[in-house]
Amino acid sequence: KTTQKKQTQKKAFSPKMLVYENLKNENVLKHFNNRFAQLDTLLNHPIWVQSPVINLGLNRQHTADIRNTDSLYWAKTAHEQLAIARHNGLEVTGQVYARPDAYFDADNDDAEQVSQYKAKTQAELGWNIINSKFYQGKEKKAKVALANELSRLQSKKRLTADIYEKAAEELTEQYNFYIGTIIAHRLDNLDIMNEAYQFMLEKDRISNDKMLKVMNEKLAAEYDISILCSDRDISNKPIYRMKPTRILVDTTALWHHIDQESIDARIVMVKEQIADNDSKLANYLSTTRITPFARWSSYWQSNNKISNNGDIGVRFTIPIYNENPRKRKALETEKEIIRSSRCTDVKEIKQSVGILLKRIENLNQAIATEAFHIDQTGKYIDMRRFAYKNQKQGYNYLMRMDEYTGLLESMERMYKLMLNRGLAIINIEKAVSIYDNNTIFREIEL
């Protein structure tokens, strides 16, 4: 079981220091020739791959969470608006009370005019029209809808906050694999050059500084691989060739998204709508209470008779102050604060996005330059291959290996440039809250 477990584990990269003793010239040259043949085969038959593209968007868990949260907010809004729709303003009040002493003693002639009863029952049906659906019902429904929409958007922003980090991590992991395989091939070249320099050092045909330079390059390459592909086996991999591309950005659509379509923009719009709606609700009439009513009263008189009477009227409460103009001024000021804050945020976002767009354009140019260099170096190697074969008296094996290594280094640089460009795009998408596939960025082959 232990053996099977070890076999199923991925083979990770581990650095090695090669020390050669008793080297022979023919063996060193054989290693060079074998490596040249291997590189020619790998370069002439590469594995062409598309540049890794992360379709930034919501995964299944994100989608399920957001749909569930959205449905809850919409259900909450529906229930609250239904409650408002059922609020007709009708209210029933009543009272029952008794008088222990049903008679009043008095010495004047008006004593008989005093109402005399043992108990009283009173019921009243009133219509509180101001506090009902019939007065500003549309605005009252809008108030709960806007409050829930604001909470829904803020919740959605929290739920989608981590997709950018995950996208960057996935993009980096894919590029690291291709970069790591290129470095691994370059490391194989350095191992052979290290062997050659050790042989030459034994023969006193080279100074220590050249050998140290190769060893330092080897250590740096091993360090890079240990960082990029510490948990992946990249030995004996083909050479992955990536087609160079250029990123086109629809800046008009990008600025429109920032101003109108991003979650932050929609949150600001909802906040402004809330302030507008609150301004409509803040009026003098809404602070009054006007209640038409119909009242029925029954009296148990002191002579044990029952008398009834009905009343209709209007009960009202009118404040002698009016604070609503100040409230509306405060709400207008709040809207100005919201707009000012949004303008500042948009300005900062556009500045940072502008820097990233400039970086993308610079990376586009650098990638095109590196792609041209790769193409020219490949043609140079093809041309030199025939020249080396026709040289009867031999040639400089170290120089030829440097040519292959230079090509690999150029490919490595281009892949790193393309990775940095992809990360810059993700940073823009994060800054402007793009969380789904979009047409703002378009990738074309050079």
Locations of the language-model features?
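Acidic, low-complexity, intrinsically disordered peripheral segments
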Residues: K1-L29, N33-L58, T63, D231, ...
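Intrinsically disordered, low-complexity segments enriched in Gly and acidic/Ser/Thr residues
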Residues: M269-S279, W296-L408
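Amphipathic alpha-helical coiled-coil scaffold segments and their short linker/junction regions
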Residues: Y20-N22, L42-G89, N208, R232-A294, ...
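Amphipathic alpha-helical coiled-coil segments and their boundaries
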Residues: N25, R60-T69, I130, F134-V144, ...
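Leucine-rich amphipathic alpha-helices with coiled-coil/heptad-repeat character
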Residues: L43, E80, G89, S155-D162, ...
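A subset of solvent-exposed loop/turn segments in beta-rich extracellular surface proteins, enriched
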Residues: V28-R60, Y97-Q154, L190-A196, L212, ...
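Charged, solvent-exposed structural "stalk/scaffold" segments
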Residues: H31-F32, K140, V144-S151, S155-A161, ...
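A glycine-/polar-enriched beta->alpha junction
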Residues: Q61-I66, S71-Q95, R99-K143, K156-T160, ...
